[in-house]
Design a protein with these regions (language model features):
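N-terminal pre-catalytic segment of deacetylase/amide-hydrolase enzymes
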Residues: 40-41, 95, 99
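N-terminal, membrane-interfacial amphipathic/helix-forming hydrophobic leader that caps
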Residues: 1-73, 144, 150-151, 211-254
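Hydrophobic alpha-helical segments of integral membrane proteins
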Residues: 14, 58-63, 90-97, 187, ...
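Glycine-/small-residue-rich active-site loops that bind phosphorylated ligands and cofactors
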Residues: 49, 79, 130
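Alpha-helical transmembrane segments
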Residues: 2-14, 77-92
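Transmembrane helix-loop-helix hairpins at the membrane interface
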Residues: 15-18, 98-101, 105, 112-253
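Short alpha-helical transmembrane interface motifs in multi-pass membrane proteins
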Residues: 41-42, 53, 81-88, 118-123, ...
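Membrane-helix interface/capping segments
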Residues: 69-73, 102-109
Length: 254
């Protein structure tokens, strides 16, 4: 009876984790760690609070559930296997991020140096919360009730994609596909290894690589809408006057 009650409480915590993921935009965290149109970022402490709240809920899940490592896979797993598969799939994530940046911008669009610490914290924190929630709790509970592993992996990937809202109107198609495929591959890694260690490592590397290559945490602008593609960026600074030279005799008179 006590064990059943603890599993039900763990299920309730999982639901709160999914709700928290839905609310990432309000915190300016995860894919939404982006500056506004006027160039201002949300409060660092608001973004940090989302990560800390996620960590707290995952911690509560580990305490409440009778056996989170065996049933939910919320553990590193075999260290060598986790490192090998994590870095292997992480390398694929780096490659696709660079390929997308070269296709979209014609170059690697490195972000300003001062944004790296916050982006790395956001990437690692988001990867841990996501993997513990979707590849750990949700996938583990689906497998625990006897659902076929393939069906369970596909189900958690779709739930994950819905929770990130990357398929909403106006959002990047690239991020939608990356989120869905990433969820499927991370689920597969978790089933194969029996833990989320490899999936977490690959996820964190991929998320940080997308930021480094595109300058975005997860919301690449549509063509013509990046700051360097805007008319304001290409125009002369306010107060400057352009001189139109028609020939070598000097400026034209207008």
């Amino acid at each position: 009876m006590e064990e059943t009650l603890r599993v039900l409480v763990a299920l309730a915590i999982t639901i709160f984790l999914v709700i928290l993921r839905f609310e990432a935009e309000k915190f300016g965290a995860a894919e939404y760690d982006e500056p506004s149109r006027d160039g201002h970022r949300g409060s660092f402490f608001r973004r940090l609070s989302w990560i800390l709240l996620g960590f707290a809920l995952v911690g509560a899940l580990l305490v409440v559930h009778p056996d989170p490592a065996a049933d939910l896979g919320v553990a590193l797993g075999d260290r060598g296997e986790a490192l090998l598969l994590g870095f292997g799939f992480g390398a694929l994530g780096m490659f696709q991020a660079a390929a997308y940046a070269l296709f979209r911008y014609g170059r690697i669009r490195l972000p300003p140096a001062w944004t790296y610490p916050g982006a790395v914290l956001n990437g690692i924190g988001t990867a841990f919360v996501d993997e513990a929630t979707f590849r750990g709790a949700i996938l583990g509970l689906l497998l625990l009730v006897g659902i076929n592993p393939v069906t369970a992996v596909v189900t958690q990937a779709f739930v994950y994609t819905l929770a990130t809202r990357t398929g909403a109107p106006g959002r990047s198609h690239y991020m939608f596909v990356l989120t869905l495929v990433g969820g499927l591959l991370a689920g597969l890694l978790t089933v194969v290894t029996g833990a989320i260690g490899a999936a977490f490592l690959a996820h964190a590397i991929t998320r940080i690589s997308v930021f480094v290559c595109t300058g975005h945490a997860g919301q690449p602008a549509r063509r013509g809408e990046e700051i360097e593609e805007s008319w304001e960026y290409r125009a002369a600074p306010r107060g400057w006057h352009l001189i139109d030279r028609q020939d070598d005799d000097g400026p034209s008179k207008r």
